[in-house]
Structure formats: structure tokens, C-alpha cells
């Protein structure tokens, strides 16, 4: 009978290991039939089998039906719940055992409970367990003490972890690696390296911990340790190589990436989804999309069950702004048997954002809802960004409020959308909420809030945001420095803007254009041209907006000759084709000077059809210079081109009244009444 029990127990354990579910059930049925199901030894093995099957409810049922239990019974259940990702259940069962006083915990139980405490962050219980370990003289157990160190590490309690580590007389490689991993996860790489050098015999796990830690920090030292690891004669495995490829992605190190690609092939990892994804990411981030696509297409058939590889290729297309290819790939994923995960859906939403396509976005949004990812940490934030980006601020705001975890991505997307759509008050409110929550406003959020200050000419708020920039070290960042200059310029404090601009370490065409436009807006046209020439002298090419800033400055200051010269320079020296706005500045100046023939010639030479603004500008000048003949021509152009625009009739009425052309004025007012336009200068007070 004893032999039979051992054979039955061995059979149950084997079924659990090889996942032979039906055979295991059959053996359990035999156990019940033989009337030995209440045998503690057999019942424990039945529980162990169900734990291996990850059928914890069945295991718990057997547990509850037992008339007698021992410490193995309790430990198997607690370990099972912990391993199955249900640490709260494990802790609950441990407390139940203590309350029942059926059994005293042993080192295996303590180890399982400490692991559960680490997962849920129950440090208080963990400390009580640690005290019990001390009272029972179990601190000499390396495996158990490793569990203590691991619990502290998982919860970022590195001082306590280090203290517990020092109590281990002969630390194992697991002891060292657990503590090194803790420092790496906390970003304390100098401490991790120091500990690594103290370790008697670092193994593959030790090296991988350091390499992974440097990758997480975006540090090129990851590659330094990868090379050192290989020189030490250790094998670069399926963890180290993808980490190395990721490090190459950060630095755009294509040559090194190709060398690691060879290592992947030599190591036989070319069919590993993890390695393939890393290769695709590396080539995509290094701007070699053709190589990335080659890797993807070569391995697609072998790994078509791994959505991670498809996600990497989708991300690669998006990084390189190949939106059409990304959309095509998304369609392929949809038509395959692959299930969309949060990364796939995030990629799909980014395509919609890039296309600014609300219709497509709503379709993807429906797919997100069906897939159950609407309130996902990543997907939810990008959904907010999508709706905000297309101007659908109301829906974006509703989605934002429904998110259980509002991260910086969600705030950033909504604030940017609000600024873009002119919801300045909401943008300010969101910014204040972000600060209250203790979230770290990045330079892009700050630059958007500065745009709000510029739009509202809110100097007080602008100065407060400037203070925040100094505190966070953003003042020297190009994106925030440019926004600060723009804010001071638009708030009328151009001298402060100039000081900031002159102190910028990096100045691109956008920042130069901003200060040039600012000088023009503040009537300092000479300085606008002086800074323009400074920009040219250091080799920065002006763009169309730069020239528009100069021409606007000339228009405001009545500098016709300078405007003529600037327009010609723009075309002949820089090959830039002017927009209507550029021509408008010169036409307006010619009109102000009464040079109507030259203005008309310029309009006729324009490669663009003149718009209402240009004709209206010339119309106003005709009134000033009493040019009734040209007014008739312009009136014909305006009425033919913009017959339904009430402002056209208002402008014509003003011109006719100025010139005393009463018959024409009467006709225009009659036409305006038919259109439903309100006559200029007329109001009724009831």
C-alpha cells in the first residue's frame, strides 16, 4: 500500500509537470474510488498537480475538503497563489493558517509569503515575517534571506535590502544579483557597478542586470559592458543581445547594430520574436527602414503568431513617418488571426493622429472599446491625444476624466489640443491640475502654456512660467527658450525677449524668426533687419515666415524700398516662392504710397490668384488717394470673387462714401440688404 501511494503521488506530480490534464483527472478519480482522497500525502500531491495546471480554484476545493492538513498543504497553496499572480490570496491564506494555529510556518512558507509581500507592497507583514525568521534562527538560510532582500528590492527599499544582504554570511549569486537588480531598477547605476565589482564571480545574470539597467537609462555604457561580457568568455544570450540592439537604437549606432545582428544569427536566435523585434527596432531607429523591413519579411512566416514583431514593424513605419505603409501593415494585422494588444492599438491611433483623420480615428476608437483597452494606461492617453489633436476637445476632455491613471502623456495631449483649438482657459486649468498632482511638466507642456500666455498677452502668468523654467532647467532648452522669447515679445516686453534670445545656446531658424517678427511687431524695424543679417552671417537660411516677418515690419513702418528689396531677395537669392501674405505687404505699401500702377502690375505678375485682403487693401488706398477709377475695377473683382461676403459690401460702402460716389453707394447698400448684411455705421438702440 505504501508503494502504491508513492506511485500514485509520482503519477500526479508527473501529470502536473507535463500538463497531462485528462490523465491527472483520471488518477484523481482513481484516488477517490479507492477511498484514499483524505490521505494528506495524496491530497497534497493532487493540490500540487492543480497548481501546476494553474487551476487554483480546483486546488482550493481539494484543500477545503481535507479533514487534515499539514504545513506542506498550506505552503503549496500559498506558493501556488503567489506564482499565479494572486499574492493577496496567498497572504489571506497565510493569515488564516496563523489564526487556525494548525501548523507552524517553516522556511518554505516564509519564502512564499515574502514573495507575496514583495508583489503587493505589504512591507509591514514582510517585516513581521522577517522578525519571525530572526526569532526562529533562520537567518542563516541563504534562500530565505534572498526572499527578504527581494521583497525590499521590489518595493524600492534599498537601504533595508542592503542591510538584509549584509546579514547573509555567504551570499549566493542570487543574493548579489537581486541587490544589483534593485540598484539598476532605481537608476543608481554607479552603486550597481560598485556592487558588481565586489561580486566574487559575476554570472550571465549579473552582466545582464547591468546591461539592462544602462539600457533603461539610455546610457551607451550598456554596449561597454556587453563588449566586456563577451571578452570575459560569457555567451551573449537572448537577453543580452536584444538589450545591446536597443542601446544601438538610442545612439543611432548602425554599424554596431549590424555586428550584433551577426551575433544574433551565429547564436541561432534569428527566429526568436524578442530578438527579431529588437532588430527591427534598431534598424528603424537608425533610419534603415529597408533593413528593418527585410528582417520582418524574412521572419514573418516563422513568427506570424507573435504580434510583438508586427508591432515593432508598425512602430518602425511610424518613427520614419511612413504613415501609408503603417496603415497597410495595420490592415494586414487586422485581416490575420493576430489579436490587437495595447501596442498595436497605440500604433493605430498614432496613424490617425498623423493623418489628422477623425473618421478613421473613430473607427479605431470603436476597435479599442471592443478590445477592452479604452481605459488602458497607454491607449487611453493616446485616445485623448487623438481627439484633442483633431479639435474634438469636448470628447477628449470626457475621455480624460474617465482615465483611472492620468499620466503626463494624457495631460500633454489634451493641453496641446486645447492650445491648438484656442481653449486657453481649459489649458491653464489642466496645467494647474498637473502641478497639483505632482506630475513633472516637461518642456513641451511648458512651451504650450507659454503659447497661451502669448495669445492672452498674460505677462504675469508668463513670468511665473518663466520661473518654473529656471527651476527645472528648461530655460536653455530650444523649445522653451523660443516660447519664452515669443511670450515676452507678444506681451510688449521685447527687451526681456532679446536678453533671453541672446543668451540661448542653440538658435535655429524658428527662434531667429521669432525675434525678427517680434522686432517688427514692436516697431523696431532696424533691429529686425540687423538680426536678420546676423542670422544670415552665421549660416542659418531664412524661411518664408522669416521674410514675412521682415515684410510685415516694413509695412507697419511704411518702408516701401526695403519691402521691394526683401521680396526680390526672397525670390532671387533663396528661391522661395512668396505666399499671398508676402505680396499683400508690398501691395499695401504701394497703395499707401499712391503707386497704383505698380501695385496693379505686381498683382498681375503674381503666380497666385489675389485674395480679398489684397483687393481690400488697395481699395482702402484708393479712398485715401481719391482714385475713383481704380475703385470701379476693384469693386468688379471683389463682387465677382466674393459675392456672398458681407465684409466686401462694407468695404465698398466705405470707399464709395469717402469718394462721394453716392449712386454706387446706394446700389451696394441695396445689394447688402438683399444679402442680409448689416450696413456699416448703422445701429439701433431700442
From Swiss-Prot:
Name any one Pfam family assigned in the record: PPR_1
GO MF terms listed in the record are:
RNA binding
Where the PPR repeats fall, as residue ranges, is 4-38, 39-69, 70-104, 106-140, 141-171, 172-206, 207-236, 237-271, 272-302, 306-340, 341-375, 376-406, 407-441, 442-476, 477-507, 508-542, 543-573, 579-609
Region (Type E motif): which ranges?
A: 614-686
Q: Which GO terms describe its biological process?
A: RNA modification
Superkingdom of origin organism:
Eukaryota
| Transmembrane regions | none
Alphabetically sorted, this entry's keywords are: Repeat
Stated family = Belongs to the PPR family. PCMP-E subfamily.
Would you tell me the protein name for this molecule?
Pentatricopeptide repeat-containing protein At4g08210
Q: Which organism is it from?
A: Arabidopsis thaliana (Mouse-ear cress)
Amino acid at each position: 500500500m505504501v508503494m502504491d501511494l508513492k506511485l500514485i503521488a509520482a503519477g500526479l506530480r508527473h501529470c502536473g509537470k507535463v500538463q497531462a490534464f485528462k490523465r491527472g483527472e483520471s488518477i484523481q478519480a482513481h484516488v477517490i474510488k479507492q477511498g484514499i482522497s483524505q490521505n494528506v500525502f495524496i491530497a497534497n500531491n493532487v493540490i500540487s498537480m492543480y497548481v501546476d495546471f494553474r487551476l487554483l480554484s480546483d486546488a482550493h476545493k481539494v484543500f477545503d475538503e481535507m479533514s487534515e492538513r499539514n504545513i506542506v498543504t498550506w505552503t503549496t497553496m500559498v506558493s501556488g497563489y503567489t506564482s499565479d499572480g494572486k499574492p493577496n490570496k496567498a497572504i489571506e491564506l497565510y493569515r488564516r493558517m496563523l489564526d487556525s494555529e494548525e501548523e507552524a510556518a517553516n522556511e518554505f512558507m516564509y519564502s512564499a509569503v515574502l514573495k507575496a509581500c514583495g508583489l503587493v507592497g505589504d512591507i509591514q507583514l514582510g517585516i513581521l515575517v522577517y522578525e519571525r525568521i530572526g526569532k526562529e534562527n533562520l537567518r542563516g538560510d541563504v534562500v530565505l534571506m534572498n526572499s527578504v532582500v527581494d521583497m525590499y528590492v521590489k518595493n524600492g527599499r534599498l537601504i533595508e535590502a542592503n542591510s538584509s544582504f549584509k546579514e547573509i554570511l555567504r551570499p549566493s549569486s542570487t543574493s548579489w544579483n537581486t541587490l544589483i537588480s534593485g540598484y539598476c531598477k532605481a537608476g543608481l547605476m554607479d552603486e550597481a557597478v560598485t556592487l558588481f565589482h565586489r561580486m566574487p564571480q559575476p554570472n550571465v545574470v549579473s552582466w545582464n542586470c547591468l546591461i539592462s539597467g544602462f539600457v533603461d537609462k539610455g546610457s551607451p555604457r550598456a554596449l561597454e559592458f556587453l563588449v566586456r561580457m563577451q571578452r570575459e568568455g560569457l555567451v551573449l544570450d537572448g537577453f543580452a543581445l536584444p538589450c545591446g540592439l536597443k542601446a544601438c537604437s538610442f545612439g543611432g549606432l548602425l554599424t554596431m547594430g549590424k555586428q550584433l545582428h551577426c551575433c544574433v544569427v551565429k547564436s541561432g536566435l534569428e527566429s526568436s520574436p524578442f530578438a527579431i523585434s529588437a532588430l527591427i527596432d534598431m534598424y528603424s531607429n537608425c533610419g534603415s527602414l529597408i533593413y528593418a523591413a527585410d528582417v520582418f519579411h524574412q521572419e514573418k512566416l516563422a513568427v506570424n503568431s507573435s504580434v510583438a514583431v508586427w508591432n515593432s514593424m508598425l512602430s518602425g513605419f511610424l518613427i520614419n513617418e511612413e504613415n501609408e505603409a503603417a496603415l497597410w501593415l495595420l490592415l494586414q494585422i487586422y485581416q490575420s488571426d493576430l489579436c490587437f494588444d495595447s501596442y498595436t492599438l497605440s500604433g493605430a491611433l498614432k496613424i490617425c493622429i498623423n493623418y489628422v483623420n477623425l473618421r478613421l480615428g473613430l473607427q479605431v476608437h470603436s476597435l479599442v472599446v471592443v478590445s477592452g483597452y479604452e481605459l488602458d494606461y497607454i491607449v487611453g492617453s493616446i485616445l485623448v491625444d487623438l481627439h484633442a489633436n483633431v479639435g474634438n476637445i469636448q470628447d477628449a476632455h470626457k475621455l480624460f476624466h474617465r482615465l483611472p491613471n492620468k499620466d503626463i502623456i494624457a495631460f500633454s495631449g489634451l493641453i496641446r489640443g486645447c492650445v491648438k483649438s484656442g481653449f486657453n482657459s481649459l489649458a491653464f486649468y489642466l496645467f494647474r491640475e498637473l502641478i497639483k498632482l505632482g506630475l513633472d511638466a516637461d518642456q513641451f507642456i511648458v512651451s504650450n502654456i507659454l503659447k497661451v500666455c502669448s495669445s492672452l498677452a498674460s505677462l504675469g502668468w508668463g513670468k511665473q512660467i518663466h520661473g518654473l523654467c529656471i527651476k527645472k532647467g528648461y530655460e536653455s532648452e530650444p523649445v522653451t527658450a523660443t516660447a519664452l522669447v515669443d511670450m515676452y515679445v507678444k506681451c510688449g516686453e521685447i527687451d526681456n525677449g532679446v536678453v533671453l534670445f541672446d543668451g540661448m545656446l542653440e538658435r535655429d531658424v524658428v527662434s531667429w524668426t521669432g525675434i525678427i517678427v517680434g522686432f517688427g511687431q514692436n516697431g523696431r524695424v532696424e533691429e529686425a533687419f540687423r538680426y536678420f543679417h546676423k542670422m544670415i552671417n552665421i549660416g542659418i537660411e531664412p524661411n518664408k515666415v522669416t521674410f514675412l516677418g521682415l515684410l510685415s515690419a516694413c509695412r507697419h513702418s511704411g518702408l516701401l524700398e526695403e519691402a521691394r528689396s526683401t521680396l526680390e531677395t526672397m525670390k532671387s537669392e533663396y528661391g522661395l516662392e512668396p505666399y499671398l501674405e508676402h505680396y499683400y505687404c508690398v501691395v499695401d505699401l504701394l497703395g499707401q504710397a499712391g503707386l497704383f500702377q505698380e501695385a496693379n502690375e505686381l498683382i498681375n505678375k503674381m503666380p497666385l490668384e489675389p485674395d480679398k485682403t489684397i483687393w481690400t487693401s488697395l481699395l482702402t488706398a484708393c479712398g485715401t488717394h481719391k482714385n475713383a477709377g481704380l475703385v470701379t475695377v476693384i469693386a468688379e473683382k471683389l463682387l465677382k470673387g466674393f459675392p456672398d461676403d458681407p465684409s466686401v459690401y462694407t468695404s465698398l460702402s466705405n470707399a464709395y462714401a469717402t469718394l462721394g460716389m453716392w449712386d454706387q453707394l446706394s446700389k451696394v447698400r441695396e445689394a447688402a440688404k438683399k444679402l442680409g448684411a448689416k450696413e456699416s455705421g448703422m445701429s439701433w438702440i431700442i
